């Protein structure tokens, strides 16, 4: 039998077709800052995607090496400006581990409380901004209303609305103001009472569900391959949370309240659902911390430190479950008053790499929905 050869002949516009390269950003409003996406398109389909980062690189890790252990806290809370308290917390935990320092119980519980309030502030931003990117303007106003309630109590305790500078090596800057816990409890209750608006207005919206259901599905294998963490990973069925699996601060005593929310679909909708459910749980954890603080007797919230603080020679690694995922802090000391090296492992950096896996095969129209559902901060990527 004579073998046959098949030949495909293009007619008209298909006679010669070339892929188009499209640059999204680095000043596009959907990129949350100066992130650039280099897309290769075949018609309206994305065939390959490359996130191009570095436009906001400020050399934070190098700057750490020229500042002492008190000063680096000021730099540490700036790369992810929506999670400032959690960022500075990770740095002081690494230094305290290097020093072998025990932190007073009251400071431990206060840190846990403020970390969870910071988590809610972070999540509310994305609960409002993500529907906005898909064309729904109303939720962002509700989100900022609730953020303002919590920012007021955070500002009262620390003096800052964004960069709190409340952590210190060995504890906290100072104790909580008189009557603050009562006001904080009222703020948590007020926010909780109005959180249903996101269930009704966003998750109950068929247009939102149509834009996000089945779009940008990330497999558990890809989560492990790219080091994705946080709500994005848990939406793909990866049941891992450092607060439960390797407790730090007071999370070991909060296991009955802590609920690790997971989904299995791994799409944009699942990621939003995880973020919303995690916000509800963070409010519950904040209440549990307030209850525990009410039981504690007055006491110190920091340790006395020498005028010149030096960490012993060696290295250590601390990691925390930040609002956007796992942040790691690798500290190397040569016994001086400044770190020899402080390497940051930021959640946004790893999470955004998954775009190379998520975008190929999808429509350009779905790109913004997928990008926004990764819940990242550009400063956290570039540092």
Swiss-Prot record:
Domain of life: Bacteria
Keywords, comma-separated and alphabetical: Cell membrane, Membrane, NAD, Quinone, Translocase, Transport
Sample GO molecular function, one term: NAD binding
Membrane topology according to the record: Peripheral membrane protein
Substrates-to-products reaction catalysed: a quinone + NADH + 5 H(+)(in) = a quinol + NAD(+) + 4 H(+)(out)
Pfam families noted in UniProt: Complex1_49kDa
Described purpose of this protein according to its UniProt entry: NDH-1 shuttles electrons from NADH, via FMN and iron-sulfur (Fe-S) centers, to quinones in the respiratory chain. The immediate electron acceptor for the enzyme in this species is believed to be a menaquinone. Couples the redox reaction to proton translocation (for every two electrons transferred, four hydrogen ions are translocated across the cytoplasmic membrane), and thus conserves the redox energy in a proton gradient.
Family: Belongs to the complex I 49 kDa subunit family.
PANTHER family, alphabetized: NADH DEHYDROGENASE [UBIQUINONE] IRON-SULFUR PROTEIN 2, MITOCHONDRIAL, NADH-UBIQUINONE OXIDOREDUCTASE 49 KDA SUBUNIT
Protein's name according to its UniProt entry: NADH-quinone oxidoreductase subunit D 1
Organism encoding this protein: Streptomyces coelicolor (strain ATCC BAA-471 / A3(2) / M145)
Phylogenetic placement of the source organism: Bacteria, Bacillati, Actinomycetota, Actinomycetes, Kitasatosporales
């Amino acid at each position: 039998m004579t073998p046959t050869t098949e030949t495909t002949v293009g007619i008209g516009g298909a006679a010669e077709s070339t892929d188009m390269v499209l640059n999204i950003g680095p000043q596009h409003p959907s990129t949350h800052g100066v992130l650039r996406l280099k897309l290769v398109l075949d018609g309206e389909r994305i065939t390959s995607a490359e996130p191009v980062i570095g436009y906001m690189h400020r050399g934070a890790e190098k700057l750490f090496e020229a500042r002492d252990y008190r000063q680096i806290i000021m730099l540490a809370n700036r790369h992810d400006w929506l999670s400032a308290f959690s960022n500075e917390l990770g740095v002081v935990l690494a230094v305290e581990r290097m020093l072998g320092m025990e932190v007073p119980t009251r400071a431990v519980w206060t840190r846990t409380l403020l970390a969870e309030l910071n988590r809610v502030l972070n999540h509310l931003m994305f609960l409002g901004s993500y529907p906005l990117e898909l064309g729904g303007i109303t939720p962002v106003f509700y989100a900022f209303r609730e953020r303002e309630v919590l920012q007021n109590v955070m500002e009262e305790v620390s003096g800052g609305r964004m960069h709190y500078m409340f952590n210190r090596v060995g504890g906290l800057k100072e104790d909580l103001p008189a009557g603050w816990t009562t006001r904080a409890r009222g703020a948590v209750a007020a926010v909780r009472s109005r959180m249903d608006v996101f269930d009704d207005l966003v998750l109950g919206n068929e247009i939102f569900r149509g834009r996000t259901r089945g779009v940008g599905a990330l497999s558990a294998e890809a989560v492990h391959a790219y080091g994705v963490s946080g709500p994005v990973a848990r939406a793909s069925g990866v049941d891992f949370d450092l607060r439960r699996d390797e407790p730090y601060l007071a999370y070991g005593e909060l296991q009955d309240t802590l609920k690790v929310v997971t989904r299995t679909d791994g799409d944009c909708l699942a990621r939003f659902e995880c973020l919303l459910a995690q916000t509800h749980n963070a409010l519950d954890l904040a209440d549990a911390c307030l209850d525990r603080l009410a039981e504690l007797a007055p006491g110190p919230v920091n340790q006395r430190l020498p005028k010149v603080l030096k960490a012993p020679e060696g290295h250590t690694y601390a990691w925390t479950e930040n609002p956007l995922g796992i942040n790691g802090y690798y500290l190397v000391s040569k016994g001086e008053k400044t770190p020899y090296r402080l390497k940051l492992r930021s959640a946004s950096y790893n999470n955004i790499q998954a775009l190379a896996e998520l975008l190929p095969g999808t429509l350009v129209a779905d790109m913004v929905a997928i990008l926004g559902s990764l819940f990242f901060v550009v400063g956290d990527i570039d540092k």
